[in-house]
């Protein structure tokens, strides 16, 4: 783990802010509304979420203060729900924990997904199959892998950074 003291301080500050927001009356009310919604009880209103993933590059960089690449990736993950909650006031819940990512790999039919960037906001998936009969030999078994060591390393890093918060 190569995170500077300044970046560590920033991540700890975000962890404290996340805890504060997660235990706020508004977040607790939202949790109850989501539970009612999920149980198919009549919600008082529609639940609204803004999916920040599609435009986070326009919002999050201005909020980021970490300088190291590894720290910036963690900071970005922490900022997503905080930004939804504070900037857009949508119905996104702020979690009371830092979730370690799933360290999974999936290769459908044994063919790695190929993406071609367009230079703009979109991308194109490059197909392997053009004629199913002719290209059937390309299809193999799908591959699923779990990187337990990677997940454990990320968990240890998170515990080291803000496990006491």
Q: PLM features: what roles do these ranges have?
A:
Residues 1-165:
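Catalytic cores of TIM-barrel enzymes
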């Amino acid at each position: 783990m190569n995170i500077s003291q300044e970046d560590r301080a920033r991540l700890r500050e975000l962890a404290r802010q996340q805890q504060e927001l997660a235990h706020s009356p508004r977040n607790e009310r939202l949790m109850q509304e989501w539970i009612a919604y999920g149980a198919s009880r009549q919600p008082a209103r529609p639940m609204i979420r803004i999916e920040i993933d599609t435009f986070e590059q326009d919002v999050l960089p201005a909020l980021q203060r970490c300088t190291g690449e590894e720290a910036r990736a963690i900071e970005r993950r922490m900022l997503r729900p905080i930004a939804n909650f504070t900037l857009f006031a949508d119905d996104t819940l702020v979690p009371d924990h830092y979730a370690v990512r799933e360290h999974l790999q999936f290769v459908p039919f044994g063919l790695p997904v190929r993406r071609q960037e367009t230079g703009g906001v979109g991308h194109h998936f490059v197909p392997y199959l053009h004629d199913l009969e002719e290209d059937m030999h390309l299809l193999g078994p799908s591959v699923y892998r779990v990187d337990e060591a990677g997940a454990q390393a990320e968990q240890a890093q998170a515990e080291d950074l803000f496990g006491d918060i």
